[in-house]
Amino acid sequence: MSVKKINLLDLDRKGLRALFSEMGEKPFRADQLMKWVYHFGVTDFEEMNNINKVLRTKLAAKCEIVAPEIASFQKSNDGTIKFAINVGQGQEVETVYIPEEDRATLCVSSQVGCALECTFCSTGQQGFNRNLTVSEIIGQVWRVSQFLGFHKDTGDRPISNVVMMGMGEPLLNLANVIPAMDIMLDDFGFSLSKRRVTLSTSGVVPALDKLGDAIDVALAVSIHAPNDELRDVLVPVNKKYPLQEFLAGIRRYLEKSNANRGRVTVEYVMLDHINDSTDQAHELAILMKDTPCKINLIPFNPYPGSPYGRSSNSRIDRFSKVLMEHGLTVIVRKTRGDDIDAACGQLAGDIRDRTKRLAKKQMQQNQISVTME
């Protein structure tokens, strides 16, 4: 029976240094290896010519460097690319590359599915299977970098920003998300600025406190409603961590963070005649008055079976103007990749749902149909 090899993509620099120490090697070997993997895209130990032959042989016997494969991809008319990433056992997660004039952002998944059941999000309706490993999270960045033209000779990289806004709730997978983000920030990893790595959360407050103690990255928060009554429906985790508790956690995070420059990004999906009235805009402004923030209004992106519609441009404009009258900074997000279901809230992947959510929903729909007949 062969011994399972250690995937070195599962280890941040601290973990790699511990591994090399166990092998009787100097800690700086971890720095050398990371530079080969993340700066030059090399996964074959034999190509690492500043590591001696004996150590290369030891590494090959005990370790491997394996990123998940791209199963397929689609390119939008606006240049956005959606990747289906094979994470094994017949399952796929989705990763989205969004090129712009001044940046190139990769939207990364943290879980196979999602347990939070936000009612406006396609991923939330697919159910949940498992957390992604460190290698499956950082491997999305590595694999897409290779696909886009990672230059081994110069070390030039095509990704300037990473957002943990793909499938899953990152704060429910902190044990793997934090080391993955460490690699993104590490000078020997992807060497991204802490202001260019963003984690988005729906509000798992105890984990948000742990995040603030462990790492400093930009924070985006999914609010989506100006009061608990509506947010309980749209974002069910609100029943456990209501808005005032969430906002207090956000303020605690901001006190620890330099990456956010003192304010958080508030994400607010615009649902037609659900959360987009001028009264609700006033209510949102009052809610956020003690929390330094900028508001990102997100036009809803419909998906098959969605119960909601997108707010009209005129309703979004009115909502935005009310917020600005209260002195808030407001950005209306430009929709990208919606023609290939790669926009915010549309990611689904291929999930074997351990929660049986889709099956339960179908059963409920069948029962309703029988009753109506």
Swiss-Prot record:
Stored Gene3D superfamilies: 1.10.150.530, Aldolase class I
Q: Which domain of life is it from?
A: Bacteria
Q: What's an example Gene Ontology biological process for this entry?
A: tRNA methylation
What InterPro entries is this protein classified in?
Aldolase_TIM, Methyltransferase_A, RlmN_N, RNA_MTrfase_RlmN, rRNA_lsu_MTrfase_RlmN/Cfr, rSAM
* Record-listed [4Fe-4S] cluster binding positions: 114, 118, 121
Catalytic activity from the UniProt record: adenosine(2503) in 23S rRNA + 2 reduced [2Fe-2S]-[ferredoxin] + 2 S-adenosyl-L-methionine = 2-methyladenosine(2503) in 23S rRNA + 5'-deoxyadenosine + L-methionine + 2 oxidized [2Fe-2S]-[ferredoxin] + S-adenosyl-L-homocysteine; adenosine(37) in tRNA + 2 reduced [2Fe-2S]-[ferredoxin] + 2 S-adenosyl-L-methionine = 2-methyladenosine(37) in tRNA + 5'-deoxyadenosine + L-methionine + 2 oxidized [2Fe-2S]-[ferredoxin] + S-adenosyl-L-homocysteine
Q: What else is known?
A: Reaction proceeds by a ping-pong mechanism involving intermediate methylation of a conserved cysteine residue.
Name this protein carries in UniProt: Dual-specificity RNA methyltransferase RlmN
Q: Where is the Radical SAM core domain?
A: 100-339
Query: What CDD domains does its record include?
Result: Radical_SAM
Q: Which residues does the Swiss-Prot or TrEMBL record annotate as the active site? A: 94, 344
Summary of the function given for this chain in its UniProt record? Specifically methylates position 2 of adenine 2503 in 23S rRNA and position 2 of adenine 37 in tRNAs. m2A2503 modification seems to play a crucial role in the proofreading step occurring at the peptidyl transferase center and thus would serve to optimize ribosomal fidelity.
In its UniProt entry, the species of origin is given as: Shewanella frigidimarina (strain NCIMB 400)
Which PROSITE patterns does the entry mention?
RADICAL_SAM
Which gene is this protein's source?
rlmN
Family statement drawn from the similarity comment of this UniProt entry: Belongs to the radical SAM superfamily. RlmN family.
Q: Which UniProt keywords apply?
A: 4Fe-4S, Cytoplasm, Disulfide bond, Iron, Iron-sulfur, Metal-binding, Methyltransferase, rRNA processing, S-adenosyl-L-methionine, Transferase, tRNA processing
Disulfide links within the chain: 107-344
Molecular function per GO? 4 iron, 4 sulfur cluster binding; metal ion binding; rRNA (adenine(2503)-C2-)-methyltransferase activity; rRNA binding; tRNA (adenine(37)-C2)-methyltransferase activity; tRNA binding
